[in-house]
Regions:
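Non-catalytic terminal and boundary segments that flank Rossmann-like NAD(P)-dependent oxidoreductase
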Residues: 1-18
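N-terminal Rossmann NAD(P)H-binding glycine-rich loop of SDR-like oxidoreductase domains
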Residues: 18-34
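Conserved glycine-rich Rossmann-like NAD(P)H-binding loop of the short-chain dehydrogenase/reductase
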Residues: 40-52
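Conserved residues in the N-terminal Rossmann fold of short-chain dehydrogenase/reductase
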Residues: 47, 69, 109
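Adenine-nucleotide cofactor-binding loop residues
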Residues: 51, 73, 95
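Conserved Rossmann-fold cofactor-binding substructure of NAD(P)-dependent oxidoreductases
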Residues: 66-87
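Conserved Rossmann-fold NAD(P)-dependent oxidoreductase catalytic core, especially the SDR/UDP-sugar
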Residues: 87-90, 94-147
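Conserved small/polar residues in nucleotide/adenosyl-binding loops
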Residues: 149-151
Length: 151
């Protein structure tokens, strides 16, 4: 296995504008904290949770952060949020199995159609890099949630 230095990875973000869908979730926040240690130009956080955005902005207090209220199911909103972005991390998803079991169509709208919207917005804006954060549970789906992330 080839070993890649941390500085080489960090250099990928130098002077870049990064957008994170689901940026106020656990993975989004961890990614934001890591990116703030680089020379990233700006980080845009796209999420539906206004309270988490306010808490995150207050706790991190970094001028490179920009917060966008939005939903991956809203393609026109993605088109606006993705303007001027170099790199996208797609971490937005419904992830709690019982919620999706009782609300399968919402799961489809967010996890499947929302992901397609992210791809469409990336293509529309010629985003140079798009990274989808997934889970190992998608390999052998056993329920509605796992079937949705398997697609």
């Amino acid at each position: 296995m080839t070993k890649i230095s941390k500085s080489k990875i960090d250099n990928q973000f130098t002077n870049k504008t990064v957008l994170i869908t689901g940026g106020t979730g656990s993975l989004g926040q961890a990614l934001t904290n890591r990116l703030l240690k680089t020379k990233v130009k700006a980080i845009r956080i796209l999420s539906r949770n206004e309270n988490k955005q306010v808490e995150m902005a207050s706790s991190l207090n970094d001028d490179r952060l920009r917060f966008f209220i939005g939903d991956v199911r809203d393609l026109p909103r993605l088109y606006r949020a993705f303007q001027g972005v170099d790199i996208v991390f797609h971490a937005a998803a419904l992830k709690h199995v019982p919620v999706i079991e009782y609300n399968p169509f919402e799961g489809i709208k967010t996890n499947v159609m929302g992901s397609q919207n992210v791809i469409d917005a990336c293509l529309y804006h010629n985003i140079s890099k798009a990274i989808c954060i997934g889970t190992d549970k998608a390999v052998s789906p056993l329920n509605t949630y796992l079937s949705l992330i398997h697609i």
